[in-house]
Amino acid sequence: MSNPAFVGVPLFSRRNREAIKFALRIGQLNAIAGSEIPKIRHGSILGEINAASTSIFSQVSIEQSLRLSPSAVSEYENCPQQYKYRKIDKLPEPPSLDAERGTLVHTVLQDLFEIPAAGRTVESAIELLPSRWSAQLADKPVLLEMVTNEKEWLDRAAALLKTYFTLENPTTFEATHREMHLENYFDTNVYLHGYVDRLDVAPTGEVRIVDYKTGKAPRPGWEEKALFQLRVYALLYWKNNGVLPRLLQLIYLGDGKIVKSNPTTAQLESTEKVLHRFAKDIFISIEKEYWPAKPSRLCDWCYFKSICPAHND
C-alpha cells in the first residue's frame, strides 16, 4: 500500500461482479456512485454495466483507515464473505424485524431515564412505546409494509420491557451515560469504536457497562463469546479514561437472564491482542481480495446467500 495509514478498497473489482449485479437489481447504483450515473434498467445488466464501467466506476475510489467494532469483528470471524458484502461493498439489506424490535426497546429504555426516578415504572415504559414506534416508522417507512400486525408487534415489545423490570429496578440508580460512543485509534491505521447502551458510574467511582439484548442468553459455555463485545467497550473506556470498569453486564430480555463478568487487566490486554489479529487478517483480505465464505447454519439467515459463491457454484 502506498500509505500504510490507509486502505484502498477495490469496490468494483472482477471478484465483485456478482455483488454489483445484486446492487443494480435493487436499484442502488445511483446511491452508490452518485448522480452522474445514468439510470440502469433491470435486465441485460452485465452489458450495460460493461458499457458504463470505464466512465463511471473509474471515478470511484475509497481510501480510509480500517474501522473496527465488536460487530465487525464478529462478522469477519463468522464469514469473511459476509463482512465484505457489508463493510467493503456496503451492499444494502432490508431491515430485520428482530433488529428493529430491538431498536424500539432500546430507545424506550434509553428514554426511560429521562423520567424522574420515582416515575420509572413498567407502565411509564410501555406508555413510551407508541410515540417511539411512530418516530421509528417516520425514519424507516418500509417498516409499515413489514409489520403486518401492529398490535402484536407492540405487545411483543411490551413483553420485553416487562421482563426488564423483573431484572433491574431503574428507580434505584441513575444512568450516567446512555448510547455512549467510545472510540480510539488503537493503532495508526485502525479506528476502534462502539456504542454502549448504558454506562453507570457509582458515587464511589466504580464503572458498570450494560448492554441490552432482546434475544436469549447464550448456552452454558458460550458466555465468553458473548462477553467479547463488552470487553471491547471496557478496553476503550480503560484506554480513554484510565479506569478499569468494575462490572460488565449483558441483560437478556428474551429469557430474563443476566450474564455478568468482572474484567481484569489481563483479559482486556488479551482482547486487544485479538483485535490486532483480526485487523491484520482483514488488511490481508483487502490486499489479496481474499474473502472466503464459511458455510454454516447461519447462511439461512443471511440476506446475501443468493449471491454468495459458496451457494452459487
What are these regions (language model features)?
Residues 97, 101, 105, 153, ...:
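Hydrophobic (often cysteine-bearing) scaffold residues that line and stabilize catalytic clefts
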Residues 174-180, 192-196, 295:
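Short beta-strand or tight-loop elements
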Residues 182-273:
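Mg2+/Mn2+-dependent nuclease catalytic core
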Residues 90-98, 115-120, 219-220, 289-291:
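Short, polar/flexible loop-turn hinges at active-site or ligand-entry regions and domain interfaces
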Residues 108-180, 185:
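A non-catalytic, helix-rich entry segment at domain boundaries
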Residues 2-102:
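C-terminal, charged and often intrinsically disordered regions of DNA end-processing helicases
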Residues 8, 13-16, 23-24, 29-34, ...:
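Metal-dependent nuclease catalytic regions and adjoining charged, substrate-binding loops involved
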Residues 104-115, 281, 285:
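Solvent-exposed, amphipathic alpha-helical segments
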